[in-house]
């Protein structure tokens, strides 16, 4: 997907809370919105090059949103609204192995008391529920999720197992929002409950997809699958 709004590279200064950050724009420090509640502490390091996007909402307190940052040569997207858009585009273009047959794509659909990112249907009306998780944590080519404990993420995995137990297709897709990665693993050290739930989901027949992205300062798209190590 191409970013419709104009972007700029600036210097990151600090992040006082989850939703706010400060960057240097035209030699002056300015407040920007951070559309990501994760820690991102390995990415948003004072002095790093950051990617900001121009915004034009009348009720906004800031002119820009901080949507990415460079870690070495890797540009990493941190806009939490982007992964579902990237995956939807990939589903439409049949780029996800194993999900090509699904022709109907619906966002934010429920199964029982659970809400998932996507509900897919094939021409025979067979259903498939897909949850998407954006991945930004990387070290020496190994990506991990989550970067902070996530009860919600664990709950999603257990709910996908319930979907599968009802003989309905279910999967989770980890979208690695950077290039130059070799493999993906659950972050046992940070959230052992999530790691255990992911392994249980795998053994229960829930599909686990891992894809990396092609990322630039004006676009991001799903590119290639990444090795899963459980």
Curated annotation (Swiss-Prot):
Gene3D superfamilies: 2.40.50.580, 3.40.1350.60. It comes from the Bacteria. One of its GO terms (molecular function) is DNA binding. NCBIfam families: sfsA. Belongs to the SfsA family. This is Sugar fermentation stimulation protein homolog. The gene is sfsA.
């Amino acid at each position: 997907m191409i970013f419709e709004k104009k972007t700029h590279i600036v210097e990151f200064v600090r992040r006082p809370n989850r939703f706010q950050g400060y960057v240097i724009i035209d030699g002056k420090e300015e407040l920007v919105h951070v559309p990501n509640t994760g820690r991102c502490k390995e990415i948003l390091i004072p002095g790093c090059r950051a990617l900001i996007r121009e915004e034009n909402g009348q009720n906004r307190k800031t002119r820009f949103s901080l949507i990415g940052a460079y870690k070495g040569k890797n540009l990493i997207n941190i806009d939490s609204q982007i992964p579902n858009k990237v995956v939807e585009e990939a589903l439409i273009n049949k780029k996800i192995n194993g999900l090509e047959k699904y022709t109907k794509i619906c966002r934010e659909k429920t199964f029982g008391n659970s809400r998932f990112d996507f509900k897919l249907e094939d021409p025979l009306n067979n259903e498939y529920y897909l949850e998407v998780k954006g991945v930004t944590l990387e070290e020496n080519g190994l990506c991990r999720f989550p970067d902070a404990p996530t009860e919600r993420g664990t709950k999603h995995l257990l709910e996908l197992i319930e979907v599968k137990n009802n003989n309905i297709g279910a999967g989770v897709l980890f979208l690695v929002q950077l290039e130059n990665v070799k493999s993906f693993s659950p972050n046992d050290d940070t959230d052992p409950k999530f790691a255990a739930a992911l392994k249980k989901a795998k053994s229960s027949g829930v599909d686990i997809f891992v894809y990396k992205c092609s990322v630039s300062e004006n676009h991001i798209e799903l590119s290639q699958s990444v090795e899963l190590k459980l």
